[in-house]
Amino acid sequence: MAQIEQFRRRFKREVVYQSHCVHSNIVPIYLCDLFAENPWFIMDKAECDLEHEITNNLLTTDQKISIVKMVLDGVAHIHAKGYLHRDIKPFNVLRFSDGTYKVSDFGLVKDTNPEGDTTKLTEIGTRMGSTRYMAPEILYNAEYSVKTDVYAVGRLIEDLNLDDKKIKPIIAKCTRMDKDDRYQTIDDVAFDFVHSFLRSES
């Protein structure tokens, strides 16, 4: 029974946090019932996830650049709401029929707002997220932060295998071993990413 109750609480938090993040690059929640015997929510049906497209080499360079911009916009909005996603990876980026890519899966989101829900639903010492996208400090039980999401975004950009020398320094700065050497915010990542292409076009 305790496990069922924990699942219900986690599910509720996931839906509430995701519904708070209304943005064109975040999967929207249209309707939900969090108090039903079997809680549920309704969202758009995605065509596929980014991991599938990367694995099957389905993306052009222009598409990859556009996807990075959309992911950065979505994650920046999550952070602006005072949340940490904590599970950014290609599998959690979904493509929809209009060609838009949206960040999904708020199951591990943490609310950092002072008045936020501080209930711990995961045992102390349990590491969350996927190992490849997990910042090094998390392996030593450090606190999650904006910079742990920055690290994960850097790994996601790396996965897209953009054959462009301008991108490598951005990936390197996102994924520094020491978090203090990484970008301070997702907006900083976006600024360098966008301007690296503007400089090349001028």
What are these regions (language model features)?
Residues 79-95:
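Catalytic-loop of the protein kinase fold
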Residues 149:
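Conserved catalytic-loop aspartate of Hanks-type protein kinases
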Residues 3-20:
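AlphaC helix of the eukaryotic protein kinase fold
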Residues 50-60:
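AlphaC helix of the protein kinase catalytic domain
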Residues 28-39:
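Short beta-strand micro-motifs within the conserved protein kinase catalytic domain, predominantly
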Residues 67-68:
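Activation segment signature within eukaryotic-like protein kinase domains
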